[in-house]
């Protein structure tokens, strides 16, 4: 059994997870269709875990009196997780704080990822625990799966859409190199539908704070595609690089640092605040439709 990756499946749907970043690196249907982006030159990741921050951190900030030196989206995506369990239908991985992580983020944590292939699709669970006896854990966690766009390589990118499971707010937020912009702008989502086109992402990601939906269908010209669902996350990002062959659907708990924020890391908007011994759980799932 490989120490670096684990493949599993059920009912013809197969997945591969890497110990590096606990990242889902492949998701393939019974017909051999790849649902997940191949980490090609346009973006060299598949489905990174964003922890302990989503987006860019505040500049020159501290936590518990010590400097925070995180880079965008944190360090979990680039660390080696420990295998706790590997079976024919899933796996469990763990990441805990180390002297190395304390140099970047001075806090104790324990993060479990639980991958499980169910009857119709893949379920990915997250359990974040604060093992400290006396300090609150202030952190964010987000997911960043990149799905193939076009869904079917034999079709073009035209006539793909997202259909949300409920009506969303009439405004969205955007980011700049300096962080989350304060202004709300009109939403391109109407009657639950977002027709996909590259021009939507010329201003970077579509950001939905306190998103109402807990699921979305991503479909192509013939109506087939995938259904994604989630619980435990508050916010949502939709992103691609214009012209690239993928679309990221990103449930988050947290978001990029607002432009102009200069406080202590614990005061950054959007964070989880876990008391000693407390845990937070969330999941997302995806199935072909």
Language model segments and positions:
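Short, Gly/Pro- and small/polar-rich lid/capping loops
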Residues: 1-11
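Acidic/His-leaning functional-site neighborhoods
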Residues: 13, 73, 78-85, 190-269
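Acidic-aromatic substrate-binding/catalytic surfaces of carbohydrate-active enzymes
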Residues: 14-68
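Short, well-ordered beta-strand segments enriched in hydrophobic/aromatic residues
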Residues: 15-17, 113-115, 122-132
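Short Pro-Gly-centered flexible turn/kink motifs
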Residues: 17, 63-67, 126, 272-288
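Extended, loop-rich substrate-binding clefts of extracytoplasmic carbohydrate-active enzymes
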Residues: 70-119
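Beta-strand-rich interaction surfaces with strong enrichment in secreted/lumenal proteins
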Residues: 112-114, 269-274
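Active-site/ligand-binding surface loops and adjacent short beta/alpha elements
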Residues: 136-138, 146-230
